[in-house]
């Protein structure tokens, strides 16, 4: 691998053509499937033999449950708990995808705008449907802040509408950009270590190690940010704040 961006190349593992459309099973597909498999295996093993005194897996699952549940309660309220399964699935999928991408010779599917955009657009559509289902045409009121002078409507409504429609763009680009930039930085710094050799590469190696730890933190943080923004959008749809 010579180019820092070569690590993001999607490579077909099993070529599949359907009516002239390429739907091949790729390295990205494999990692997404692995992510789903790991998440399912974790929750299955954590909940299969529940005990009053929890073991390590059950404790981890309970901590994860409370973490996501508190995120929903704090940002949406108790009424948002009905969407807990979706929020939990979203967080675990993005979190594991980011973490698996940190492994050597792995693939970070969250570094592809197509994946993050699909997630963001799905969230946007779901939140919009929830908003209209709950409030009907009154949902349009969120584009005009309560208490604002009527004369400001021609200015505020377009601004609020553009802000609302840009949500899937900002949500997808934030995750995609952070994961892409972080991995490119790691690749470039790792290349310096190899070029400088054992002696000259001591300092760069320490830098790479520090950046790697930071990248793990960013990977976890981005999963949290992605999920909490989803909760905020959901709160807007439910409570119209």
Curated annotation (Swiss-Prot):
Tell where it localizes.
Answer: Cell inner membrane
> What Gene Ontology terms describe where this protein resides (cellular component)?
plasma membrane; proton-transporting ATP synthase complex
Q: Which Pfam families match?
A: ATP-synt_A (PF00119)
Does the keyword section mention Glycoprotein? no
Query: Do you know which PROSITE patterns this protein is assigned to?
Result: ATPASE_A
Any stretches that span the bilayer, and where are they? 23-43, 83-103, 113-133, 188-208, 209-229
For this UniProt entry, the molecular function terms from Gene Ontology, in alphabetical order, are: proton-transporting ATP synthase activity, rotational mechanism
Assign the protein's first listed, main location to one coarse class. membrane
What are the alphabetically sorted keywords of the record?
Answer: ATP synthesis, Cell inner membrane, Cell membrane, CF(0), Hydrogen ion transport, Ion transport, Membrane, Transmembrane, Transmembrane helix, Transport
Q: Which residues form a coiled coil?
A: none
- SUPFAM superfamilies according to UniProt: F1F0 ATP synthase subunit A (SSF81336)
Membrane topology annotation: Multi-pass membrane protein
Question: By its UniProt entry, which NCBIfam families does this protein fall under?
Answer: ATP_synt_6_or_A (TIGR01131), PRK05815.2-4 (NF004482)
Briefly state the protein's biological role.
Key component of the proton channel; it plays a direct role in the translocation of protons across the membrane.
> Which family, according to UniProt?
Belongs to the ATPase A chain family.
Self-association or partners: how does it assemble?
F-type ATPases have 2 components, CF(1) - the catalytic core - and CF(0) - the membrane proton channel. CF(1) has five subunits: alpha(3), beta(3), gamma(1), delta(1), epsilon(1). CF(0) has four main subunits: a, b, b' and c.
What protein does this entry describe?
Answer: ATP synthase subunit a
| Provenance organism | Rhodospirillum rubrum (strain ATCC 11170 / ATH 1.1.1 / DSM 467 / LMG 4362 / NCIMB 8255 / S1)
